[in-house]
């Protein structure tokens, strides 16, 4: 492999990775979110950094935004579009520091962002990851 010719994945590449990873998840898990929009940015915006009290824009890999089944909001958008934000630069930084495949990291972020939003346990999320391998 000629490493001198390889470029880092673009925002569009990340969106494709996210769509592929999401499609590999079990149907019952994907059904939690309905019509999901993927948004890939290099970093979270200043509001997210402030609201989450982050010290660095590298502290967050993704963010779920949307109505929540646990509070009875399912099917009631209240103007919120169901979205997953993936932050390309923090994910690439994480990838550089760990011996994991980039697609596996993106899938993990998707599962955990959706899972935490809907109150799934870590054990539930590990089972979903295992089922999607």
Where are these regions (language model features)?
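Active-site rim/adjacent substrate-binding subdomains
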Residues: 1-105, 117, 121-126, 132
């Amino acid at each position: 492999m000629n490493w001198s010719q390889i470029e880092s994945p673009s925002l569009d590449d990340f969106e494709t990775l996210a769509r592929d990873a999401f499609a590999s998840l079990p149907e019952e898990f994907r059904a939690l979110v309905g019509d999901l929009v993927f948004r890939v940015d290099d970093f979270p915006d200043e509001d997210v950094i402030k609201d989450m009290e982050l010290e660095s824009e590298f502290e967050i890999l993704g963010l779920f935004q949307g109505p929540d089944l646990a509070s009875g909001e399912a099917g009631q958008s209240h103007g919120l579009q169901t979205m997953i934000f993936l932050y390309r630069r923090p994910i690439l930084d994480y990838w550089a520091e760990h011996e994991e495949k980039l697609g596996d990291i993106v899938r993990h972020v998707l599962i955990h962002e959706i899972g935490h939003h809907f109150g799934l346990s870590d054990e539930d999320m590990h089972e979903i990851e295992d089922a999607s391998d």
